[in-house]
């Protein structure tokens, strides 16, 4: 008997058996073996798709992460206190958001005396570091290794390049007393929402978040209000972020938070530990 269009199953794959395979079983076996020689998945990311590795592999990975933290902590230990500025790497000099980031960072450095910290790259990051430098303030960056290398901008007094995004985000929060968010893409949204989550869950407290660019973030504001309406966040959570276009209002908001919650002082290096500022 010949079955046209019969399905056979082998492991997790299904095969359509044509008339030749059903009448000649050896052809069916040959077709399965030929298929098994082909990769089931894209081999471009084998590390992430292999699942748990050996104990030695996991230990080496943990040590690499630990070393990244040590490098970052040592490099940035005397950089603070900082205000961290986030935003797109794609805006060029002369763009509205580039110039606004430059202005806000200039005011923070000159009026509040904080170090400006960024991701160390181009665009908004460059503008923020540039504003701090022009104000005579300190300017530092925590860069990230990418497949298409993101070089540090020329306005950094100190920088460190980190391999892992999650290590970098910890460092950007650790030395900061506030975040200023400018328009950006996935990375900027990731940093914004992670910080909002940390504040909402009390992992960090009394941490002002200022979002600059009300036109750009108008859909986000609407979505946050929708979330509050649906009950997935509390109405009070809407107060975690200040949306504004006013540089003076942004600086005043940060100053109010810090004046009422912190005594800020810069750490000094210890000569007996061979530390450098």
Language-model segments: residues:
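N-terminal amphipathic/hydrophobic targeting modules at extreme N-termini
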Residues: 1-14, 20-25
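Active-site/ligand-binding-proximal alpha/beta "capping" segment
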Residues: 163-215, 261-263
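Fold-independent oxyanion-binding glycine-rich loops
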Residues: 87-89, 119-120, 142-145, 162-165, ...
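Acidic/glycine-enriched connector segments
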Residues: 123-182
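Glycine-rich beta-alpha loop segments
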Residues: 28-42, 46-142
């Amino acid at each position: 008997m010949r079955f046209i269009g019969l399905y056979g199953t082998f492991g997790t794959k299904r095969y359509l058996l044509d008339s030749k395979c059903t009448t000649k079983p050896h052809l069916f076996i040959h077709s399965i073996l030929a298929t098994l020689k082909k990769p089931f998945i894209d081999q471009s990311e084998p590390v992430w798709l292999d699942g748990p590795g050996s104990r030695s592999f996991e230990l080496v990975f943990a040590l690499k992460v630990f070393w990244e933290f040590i490098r970052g902590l040592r490099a940035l230990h005397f950089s603070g206190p900082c205000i961290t500025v986030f935003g797109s790497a794609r805006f060029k000099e002369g763009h509205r958001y580039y110039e606004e980031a430059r202005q806000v960072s200039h005011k923070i450095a000159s009026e509040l005396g904080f170090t400006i910290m960024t991701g160390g790259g181009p665009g908004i990051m460059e503008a923020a570091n540039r504003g701090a430098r022009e104000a005579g303030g300190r300017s530092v960056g925590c860069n990230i290794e990418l497949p298409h290398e993101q070089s540090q901008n020329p306005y950094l007094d100190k920088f460190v390049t980190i391999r892992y995004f999650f290590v970098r985000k910890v460092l950007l929060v650790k030395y900061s007393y506030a975040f200023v968010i400018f328009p950006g893409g996935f990375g900027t949204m990731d940093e914004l929402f992670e910080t909002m989550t940390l504040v909402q869950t009390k992992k960090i407290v009394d941490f002002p978040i200022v979002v600059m660019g009300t036109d750009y973030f108008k859909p986000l504001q609407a979505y946050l209000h929708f979330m509050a309406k649906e009950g997935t966040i509390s109405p009070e959570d809407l107060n975690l972020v200040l949306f504004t276009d006013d540089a003076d209002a942004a600086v005043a908001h940060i100053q109010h938070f810090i004046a009422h919650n912190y005594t800020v002082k810069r750490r000094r290096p210890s000569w007996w530990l061979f530390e450098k500022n």
